[in-house]
Amino acid sequence: MSYLLALDAGTGSIRAVIFDLNGRQLAVGQAEWKHLSVDNVPGSMEFDLTTNWQLACQCIRQALDAARLSAADIQSVACCSMREGIVLYDRNGEAIWACANVDARASREVAELKEIHDFRFESEVYEVSGQTLALSAMPRLLWLAHHRPDIYRKAATITMISDWLAAKLSGELAVDPSNAGTTGMLDLFSRDWRPALLDMAGLRADMLSPVKETGTLLGAVTEAAAQQSGLRAGTPVVMGGGDVQLGCLGLGVVRAGQTAVLGGTFWQQVVNLPQVRTDPQMNIRVNPHVIPGMAQAESISFFTGLTMRWFRDAFCAEEKLIAERLGVDAYSLLEEMASRVPAGSHGVMPIFSDAMHFKQWYHAAPSFINLSIDPEKCNKATLFRALEENAAIVSACNLAQISQFSGVTFESLVFAGGGSKGALWSQILSDVTGLPVRVPVVREATALGCAIAAGTGAGLYDDMASTGERLVSWHREFTPNPQHRELYQEMMSKWQTVYADQLGLVDSGLTTSMWQAPGLERRQRVASSPSP
């Protein structure tokens, strides 16, 4: 049989995942990695090129061993990664510097760039690329020009982290639109670099690598890479892409108007746009999809999964111990407890992530509002359900913003990622949005989407879109409860009002924002999000 290998470089770990041509996962090799903080450089998060390549090779060998396959059984390889992370190379093609996705060292440079063109530069960048300056590559390049001119002068090429992995395997440098689009330097409409943006920023525009679409052949595994990784020299290496967009491919979300909520550490609400366009209010990010010619509106709920982990670890030691004794997941036990709490969680309002406002992106101080001292009504089960309801409310607010500028009317949504493992959470998401929610069998779909790209580039599949639709299968579908939907609409309106007041406390310096975008020096009150 033929098998495909996906290298999936996440924020916290690297995975090598092997699939057969029917999309069945055979084996995975995984290793955690850590990013490097540079002394006296606040917000820095450098990517350890040497150690992380060793870990990638370790994972490939581990996956091959676990699957009991030889290197000759792997017919094609593709790589995907977290977006925004960039790698710079010298003129010999050697990587000389890299940073991870949320490296925030360039706050001052973000603020400087916002001032050029009579304070219109960020709007001009967004109109062309769908990105703001907060996590784009240009402020980071400007920081290097200011503080590490030795690196900046040597830099001859820039790629994303997924492309670095592919280059380590094949010796070929190129970027794909889905991942390179997050640099803020790629034209959303032409799916090619926009050098004029770098010119306007006073940056060099001579380091832009070739652009190749996801699912096209890049090269082949070199002899050196074969010795290091355990793969066979000559194995095709295919262009991969950004993790979220490839995740959508793995979920079969490949047609205009289709919608997905990806529930991980962050929650992304992703909508395939009928035509390429940006949001006049600059609330929503717009990225190239891996499907050629298609763009995705993407909103982000901050730290949703991390908030649930914090709640579990800080307050639920007893439940964790019981779950361990029963051989079940602690979240499953907490969900079972929360299912006995009535919809609305007795009015408790969690204040964590705001709806997305890409241009003025910050959040209130974390808190719970409207608690009761009645232990029958306000307890761990109540707070856990309230957190699940709030995550769904923020998702619904974000989807409403996307619908407002795009004109897309949602018919259903796909719910995937770790959050979708909870049946209660899936039902709450359906109730809050008023939409049928489908949960796939393969919930961690990014690696599968990457494998589909690998197979397409090697000629094993006809095309990515039809293959994504064919390989996805559904675990369960949830339909909305009309009575709960009405209650949640009222809760959403109240939450938006309360959240705006909580932002006011941050603005006045009385509380500390959970997170704010780099370069956001002067916060301005943002109008409340539209209701779905």
Swiss-Prot record:
<dbReference type="InterPro" id="IPR050406">
    <property type="entry name" value="FGGY_Carb_Kinase"/>
</dbReference>
<dbReference type="Pfam" id="PF02782">
    <property type="entry name" value="FGGY_C"/>
</dbReference>
<dbReference type="InterPro" id="IPR018485">
    <property type="entry name" value="FGGY_C"/>
</dbReference>
<dbReference type="InterPro" id="IPR043129">
    <property type="entry name" value="ATPase_NBD"/>
</dbReference>
<protein>
    <recommendedName>
        <fullName>Autoinducer-2 kinase</fullName>
        <ecNumber>2.7.1.189</ecNumber>
    </recommendedName>
</protein>
<dbReference type="GO" id="GO:0005975">
    <property type="term" value="P:carbohydrate metabolic process"/>
</dbReference>
<dbReference type="GO" id="GO:0009372">
    <property type="term" value="P:quorum sensing"/>
</dbReference>
<dbReference type="InterPro" id="IPR018484">
    <property type="entry name" value="FGGY_N"/>
</dbReference>
<keyword id="KW-0418">Kinase</keyword>
<dbReference type="Pfam" id="PF00370">
    <property type="entry name" value="FGGY_N"/>
</dbReference>
<comment type="similarity">
    <text>Belongs to the FGGY kinase family.</text>
</comment>
<keyword id="KW-0963">Cytoplasm</keyword>
<keyword id="KW-0808">Transferase</keyword>
<dbReference type="InterPro" id="IPR000577">
    <property type="entry name" value="Carb_kinase_FGGY"/>
</dbReference>
<comment type="function">
    <text>Catalyzes the phosphorylation of autoinducer-2 (AI-2) to phospho-AI-2, which subsequently inactivates the transcriptional regulator LsrR and leads to the transcription of the lsr operon. Phosphorylates the ring-open form of (S)-4,5-dihydroxypentane-2,3-dione (DPD), which is the precursor to all AI-2 signaling molecules, at the C5 position.</text>
</comment>
<dbReference type="GO" id="GO:0071518">
    <property type="term" value="F:autoinducer-2 kinase activity"/>
</dbReference>
<dbReference type="GO" id="GO:0005737">
    <property type="term" value="C:cytoplasm"/>
</dbReference>
<dbReference type="InterPro" id="IPR033676">
    <property type="entry name" value="AI-2_kinase"/>
</dbReference>
